[in-house]
Amino acid sequence: HTRSLSVSWLGDVYKRQVVVLGIYYKLQTFLYLPANGIVQGMRPLIGYNYGAKQHARVKKLYELTLIMSAAIMAAGTVICLFASRPLMQLFTSNPETVAIGQTALRIICLGFVVSAVSTTSSGALEGLGKGAESLVISLCRYIVFIMPLAAVLCHFLGANGVWHAFWITEVLSAIVAYPVYRKAVGKR
């Protein structure tokens, strides 16, 4: 799991950052939940329309889901940018941890909107019965990009490098996800 691997990179030196990472993952669950729900709802619809050879509907469903997910994630970005302190204070009263968490949320949330591309593409591929292609996107998000980026950026930026690894991973994953989706949909 990404969280366990990220924590191992931070180790004992960054105990407060490890706490912040745990808090972020709790918040992430709530921030991504509405977008993930929309993606879950798209899966059977896109699969049905693909099977019925209604390719224009497949495209429309993908685009609509992408727009709705991006809008939800834009709201999440705004919340994290402007309410990072109260969000952190839901979990801790330690001022140092809150300060570190504010920085983390403000950096990580920069990738929220673009994450809609990989989550929508991955969900659409699953709905189309193309699990291998969906797995490629998931592996990019959770292992291929984030772990090396976190290790390298942590070396140069300290714990903030881990936070930057999140949004950079989302950008790189989106760059991979959309062409993987397009190629898979092109195979009829």
Q: Which residues does each PLM region occupy?
A:
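Single conserved hydrophobic/aromatic residue that forms the stacking wall/gate
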Residues: 1-14
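Alpha-helical membrane-protein architecture signal
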Residues: 6, 20-23, 97-98, 136
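Transmembrane alpha-helical core residues of multi-pass small-molecule transporters
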Residues: 11, 25-28, 72, 140-142, ...
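Short extramembrane helix-to-coil loop segments that connect adjacent transmembrane helices in Major
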Residues: 15-17, 156
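Small-residue-rich hydrophobic transmembrane alpha-helices
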Residues: 20-84, 115-134
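Alpha-helical transmembrane segments of multi-pass membrane proteins
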Residues: 29, 35, 95-121, 140
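Short alpha-helical transmembrane segments in multi-pass integral membrane proteins
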Residues: 46-111, 152-188
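Transmembrane alpha-helical segments of integral membrane proteins
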Residues: 119, 145-152
